[in-house]
């Protein structure tokens, strides 16, 4: 089997995301970005209307839908009409079940939940009924509080244990194991050293059999290491983290710079052909 790490392109329809807030709030601009990401080689586009950066304002589901729907409707219609590749997958980055339900109704393929089902008790039953792929990301606390929850005994072992707990809850809700992906949640309730430890420990996560989605793109820990405050100037640091993730068994990486990271994935797949999660 030839390894082919998948690329998830980021499309934030938010005014306050840490990297590209406000750039895609207009539906036409969001569609153009989706088309660009697809042309650059994204296998899946992750669309989000709720910023999850530290300290971000939390929206009610109704507010999130109001922000999301104009762009999402346009993107889904474009895929139906051939303005986007028919095989392009769409993911929704949300932790609200009503938002996920509406998106699935419109044709979204994946749900990417940074809360792993803890923020909305209706999410796991919804995903079970839909049968769609579901990303369980590790975090502690919320966007407002997660900086207070970086106290791990061993960050790799603790993240694995907590993802196992959420996976068990998902299984109990009727979600099938083959629907689930794990995301270690780089930057969410983790210090720089803990993020590095998680990248080093990815083979331990991969050993549990869930495909891994890893999202290091432009994260603060990269900026701290590079002493680079500008999120968009962290591409080379992101590239190094993407290589490390693939070497550790990541099956998919979530990135902003799809064209360059697609090349990096192809090269990393050739360098580490047997590390398939």
Feature map (PLM): residue ranges:
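Acidic helix/loop microenvironments that form the catalytic cleft of cell-wall polysaccharide enzymes
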Residues: 186
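N-terminal substrate-binding region of glycoside hydrolase catalytic domains
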Residues: 12
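Conserved C-terminal portion of the radical SAM core fold
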Residues: 173
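Active-site-adjacent loop and "lid" segments of alpha/beta metabolic enzymes
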Residues: 2, 15-36, 52-90, 94-98, ...
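N-terminal glycine-rich anion-binding loops that anchor highly charged ligand groups
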Residues: 4-9, 35-49
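Short acidic capping loops at alpha-helix termini that bridge into adjacent secondary structure
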Residues: 87-88, 176-179
């Amino acid at each position: 089997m030839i390894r082919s790490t998948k690329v998830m392109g980021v499309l934030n329809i938010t005014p306050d995301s840490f990297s590209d807030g406000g750039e895609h709030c207009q539906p036409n601009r969001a569609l153009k970005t989706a088309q660009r990401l697809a042309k650059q080689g994204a296998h899946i586009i992750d669309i989000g209307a709720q910023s999850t950066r530290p300290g971000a304002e939390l929206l009610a589901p109704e507010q999130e839908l109001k922000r999301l729907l104009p762009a999402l409707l346009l993107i889904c219609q474009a895929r139906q009409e051939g303005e986007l590749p028919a095989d392009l997958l769409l993911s929704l980055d949300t932790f609200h079940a009503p938002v996920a339900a509406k998106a699935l109704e419109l044709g979204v393929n994946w749900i990417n939940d940074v809360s792993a089902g803890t923020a909305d008790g209706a999410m796991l039953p919804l995903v079970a009924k839909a049968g769609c792929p579901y990303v369980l990301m590790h975090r502690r606390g919320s966007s407002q509080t997660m900086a207070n929850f970086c106290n791990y005994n061993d960050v790799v072992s603790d993240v694995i244990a907590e993802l196992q707990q959420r996976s068990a809850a998902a299984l109990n809700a009727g979600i099938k194991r083959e629907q689930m992906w794990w995301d270690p949640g780089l930057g969410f309730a983790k210090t720089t050293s803990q993020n590095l430890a998680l990248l080093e420990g990815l083979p331990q996560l991969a050993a549990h059999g869930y495909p891994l989605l890893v999202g290091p793109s432009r994260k603060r820990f990269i900026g701290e290491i590079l002493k680079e405050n500008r999120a968009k100037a962290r591409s080379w640091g992101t590239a190094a983290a993407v290589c490390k993730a693939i070497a550790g068994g990541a099956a998919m990486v979530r990135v902003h710079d799809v064209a360059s990271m697609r090349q990096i994935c192809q090269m990393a797949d050739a360098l580490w052909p047997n590390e398939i999660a």
